[in-house]
């Protein structure tokens, strides 16, 4: 039997220093994301989204990032799903990107806001037809008796809307507006590099960079 405690990797691909990063964390994220794309990593656009319920119990799931700029990080989902309900109660959330092949993580913390109706409409219209139908067919996170019922619902929605299903009112975008963004680079002997960006109105870039102990 595999002994989990014995599984370990010594990271040594790169280093991370404040003198070498961009003072703007969104620019730095774009640099790292492009490097993940260039490395042809499988689905570098996946990220873990962590939320909490009314009792303070956390939950996490993988979602896909669909936009990142100076305003924040965007993803789309069902507003009535578990994550949607939790975000309605508590808009504080965290994101985690993990690019294991590059020995890198990016941690983002902040508050969630909904994107505009126009932004949600625009992205929904760009989705494949099957995904647009699925947004109507699935009552995400609800208990269902069988997959057959889900597939029957899919056929019903397809027959109703044809090639042009509109965006459901319960489906749309969220934007995480970050208060902090941490860049993590694996290093030998577990002495990893960690640079934390936090908002700082006195800084020319609007952000302060500090180094954290690993």
UniProtKB/Swiss-Prot annotation:
Q: Which Pfam families match?
A: PNP_phzG_C (PF10590), PNPOx_N (PF01243)
What InterPro entries does this protein's entry cite? Pyridox_Oxase (IPR000659), Pyridox_Oxase_CS (IPR019740), Pyridox_Oxase_N (IPR011576), Pyridoxamine_oxidase_dimer_C (IPR019576), Split_barrel_FMN-bd (IPR012349)
Q: What is the name attached to this protein's record?
A: Pyridoxine/pyridoxamine 5'-phosphate oxidase
Q: How does it assemble?
A: Homodimer.
Reactions that this protein is recorded to catalyse: pyridoxamine 5'-phosphate + O2 + H2O = pyridoxal 5'-phosphate + H2O2 + NH4(+); pyridoxine 5'-phosphate + O2 = pyridoxal 5'-phosphate + H2O2
| A GO molecular-function descriptor | pyridoxamine phosphate oxidase activity
Cofactor binding note: Binds 1 FMN per subunit.
Keywords of this entry:
Flavoprotein, FMN, Oxidoreductase, Pyridoxine biosynthesis
Q: SUPFAM superfamilies of this UniProt entry?
A: FMN-binding split barrel
BP-aspect Gene Ontology terms: pyridoxine biosynthetic process
Q: What is its EC number?
A: 1.4.3.5
NCBIfam families in UniProt: pdxH, PRK05679.1
* Pathway per the UniProt entry: Cofactor metabolism; pyridoxal 5'-phosphate salvage; pyridoxal 5'-phosphate from pyridoxamine 5'-phosphate: step 1/1; Cofactor metabolism; pyridoxal 5'-phosphate salvage; pyridoxal 5'-phosphate from pyridoxine 5'-phosphate: step 1/1
Describe the function of this protein: Catalyzes the oxidation of either pyridoxine 5'-phosphate (PNP) or pyridoxamine 5'-phosphate (PMP) into pyridoxal 5'-phosphate (PLP).
According to its UniProt entry, this protein's organism is: Burkholderia mallei (strain ATCC 23344)
Instruction: State the similarity comment.
Output: Belongs to the pyridoxamine 5'-phosphate oxidase family.
